[in-house]
Regions:
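Active-site loop of classical SDR/Rossmann-like NAD(P)-dependent oxidoreductases
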Residues: 35, 223, 247-267, 280
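NAD(P)H-binding glycine-rich loop region in Rossmannoid oxidoreductase-like domains
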Residues: 40-82
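Mid/C-terminal beta-alpha module of Rossmann-like enzyme folds, strongest
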Residues: 195-196, 202-255, 296-304, 308-309
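Amphipathic terminal alpha-helices
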Residues: 271, 279-347
């Protein structure tokens, strides 16, 4: 088995490379600044030279707000998320190489109350979501041997601005912060990389498992619940934040484009097909915060160590932070969402 990871500098790409480095799997990694996917001849040349048995595309443009308001950003979003996927799909078809492609829950409109299934109808409402959906659509048309893995919002130590901004805002505003009132299932990029690696191994065994799959961490949450979780964990490492947390007040903002109300996915199909189980996001949150605060990981305590057990019990007994939740109505009517160019059911 030999893999080509395209999108090496994305957070998912970084986590995938980290995992692959600890295996005996041969792989090469490229990013968009090393290979211009808008030049088909260069793509064919690069893929032919590397000669992989599978291509994993985790390249993405994911700045939702910028893609919605900046024409140049929107163009770049389309180039990477749609045109780039088309180019890679054509090369993979030409060279008979299976392609595993990372996509997003933002191909949906967020109006469903339950988690989204693979068979649910796509109806993206923002530029980013449309670019991901059009990329999926062309991949299905161009390459039969494909797997599309949709995930919800990813986080990692490699891209930790959300965590940093959240902590900084909480400190600067004496515990008063604002978040969008949406429901999602934040997933550590390392967990998503684990899933891709599990898929790769079964594809290498010639498993006929082509199609679309969903994965995200266990238990969808409202964003204010996730914020509280992050801040409570951060407070264990930050004395200043720990003092502020008892007065935490979270203001809930209305969901407006480019965001969607619900982006959580049902991951039962991937379990049934590949035997891949959902993991909790908790360890991932802890890992990111330890990276931010420069915590060095120590060896786990030996069983029977009474001091370690007492310390752990004290941590578990830490009282839950009580928050004030304030829902804010939109100041102006929400803009109507233009329909996607085409909606279809997935297989």
């Amino acid at each position: 088995m030999k893999l080509l990871v395209f999108g090496a500098n994305s957070q998912l790409g970084q986590e995938l490379i980290r995992l692959l480095t600890d295996t005996e799997i041969e792989f090469s990694a490229l990013d968009t600044d090393q290979l211009d996917v808008l030049k088909p001849k260069e793509v064919v040349k690069a893929v032919t030279r590397i000669n992989p048995t599978q291509l994993i595309n985790v390249s993405t443009y994911s700045n939702l707000q910028k893609a919605e308001t900046d024409p140049q950003a929107a163009k770049r979003c389309d180039q990477i998320n749609t045109d780039g996927v088309t180019a890679l799909a054509r090369v993979c078809k030409q060279l008979n190489i299976p392609i595993i492609h990372h996509s997003s829950s933002y191909v949906f409109d967020g109006q469903k109350k339950e988690t989204y299934d693979e068979e649910d109808e796509a109806n993206p409402v923002c530029s980013y979501g449309k670019s991901k959906w059009y990329g999926e659509r062309t991949l299905r048309e161009e390459s039969e041997k494909h797997i599309i893995l949709r995930t919800d919002w990813l986080f990692s130590a490699y891209r930790n601005k959300y965590f940093l901004n959240l902590i900084d805002s909480c400190k600067k505003n004496a515990g008063k912060i604002s978040v969008v009132d949406n429901r999602f299932s934040p997933t550590h990029a390392g967990d998503a990389a684990r899933v891709i690696l599990g898929i790769v191994k079964q594809v290498d065994c010639n498993a006929e498992v082509w199609g679309t799959y969903h994965y995200n961490a266990m238990q969808a949450v409202n964003q204010d619940q996730f914020v509280l979780h992050v801040l409570e964990e951060a407070a264990k490492l930050d004395a200043e934040l720990d003092k502020i947390l008892p007065s935490l007040e979270i203001e809930l903002l209305p969901v407006e484009r480019p965001y969607i109300r619900n982006s959580a996915l049902n991951a039962s199909k991937i379990m049934g097909t590949f035997g891949i189980k959902q993991h909790s996001r908790g360890p991932g949150v802890t890992a990111v915060l330890e990276e931010i605060y420069g915590v060095k990981k120590e060896k786990p305590p030996v069983q029977g160590n009474s001091a370690a057990i007492a310390s752990d019990n004290e941590s578990q007994a830490r009282p839950k932070t009580k928050t004030k939740r304030k829902k804010v109505s939109a100041k102006k009517p929400r803009q109507s969402m233009p329909p996607a160019k085409k909606a279809a059911k997935q297989k």
